[in-house]
Amino acid sequence: LPRLGQVALDALLYLNFLQLPPLQLVARWPVLYYGLPLVLMGVLAYISRDPLGLGIVFAGHLVTFYCIGTAIGLALRRIGGTPLTIWHIFWLGGITPWLLTAGIMWWGRRRALRLCTTKYSLTTRKNLPNGRLTIVQVSDVHPRACAAMDHTRIPELKAKIEACRPDLLVLTGDIFDEFTEPEELDAFCKLFGELDAPLGKYYVLGNHDLFHHWREPSFGRADLERGFAAAGVRILEDTSVLLPCGVRVVGRKDYLYTNGSRFTAAQLMPGGPDDHYTVWLDHEPRDFKNAAAAGADLILSGHTHGGQVWPAGAVGMVAKNERNYGRKNIAEHCDAIVSGGTGTWGYKFRTQGRTEIVCAEITTEREN
């Protein structure tokens, strides 16, 4: 079935390419007229060979626009007359899909590079230091030159984090990946060391930080631990920390590093809910209800990139995660926030979600 679908898409593209206006100039030479569309398809196949390259994004959007246009054209054929004529003029012999794709690529790049600060205001009945707590979440940085975040943008990222004046800084995984060069790792570890967070800095591993999905990374676990230790960042793996101010931070191992058999939420907090405000860090947005039942007050996750490329990213992430992006109320006392990522995965392109840091401001409710 996948092969038949691919053949059908190839045929659709070929027939549409035959309608391109420039080809009409060589219509009297069959070899050129029927051969040039094949060359164009070969070019698209070539630039799409890298699953992490922009070529596959470009080709995917182009094919999508051609499919939509063909479906509309076939529907209008049944009607005929003026609507069909107007459609042919609008479609301009197949040029419109190229213009739409170019527009999407331009907009997606701008959206990916725009670093936002997304603020959430929450309340709790539990006591907080001075009645308030500000948490900044950095997630899914994936630093590399061809992605949205690399060392050249560290000053901008640092300024946005410092503007929030965080009490607590949390890093929810995929801060690095298998494409991260040692220079990038050192630069970002230095950044985290320069940031001030009076209640501490905590980090949980993501599925890319140490796992080799695409290639052998240029750094190992020892390099990661050494860099974070120098920066004053504590790594949490199925561990909880009770801070002197009474706030608890729980960090979970990612599913990938436990073969799906990590500690349960109840095992991490065997005493269940208590009077300590509990910040729950889990790279992948799963198991929300069990975390809330165990005593989590605020769950912070990443991983999804908010979908990043619509609709493929949204469909893929929704299938495995309980939330794709944003805030979700889990229980009366518990909320979850899923970051869209402080960087992008693979390329400087985003049509869904935001490139962001999350600033969660929690205040203690006053009793009436």
Task: Please report, for each region that a protein language model flagged, where it lies by residue.
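N-terminal signal-anchor transmembrane helix
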Residues: 75-96, 100-164
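Soluble catalytic domains of enzymes that build or remodel membrane lipids, polysaccharides, and related
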Residues: 127-368
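Non-catalytic terminal accessory segments
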Residues: 1-113
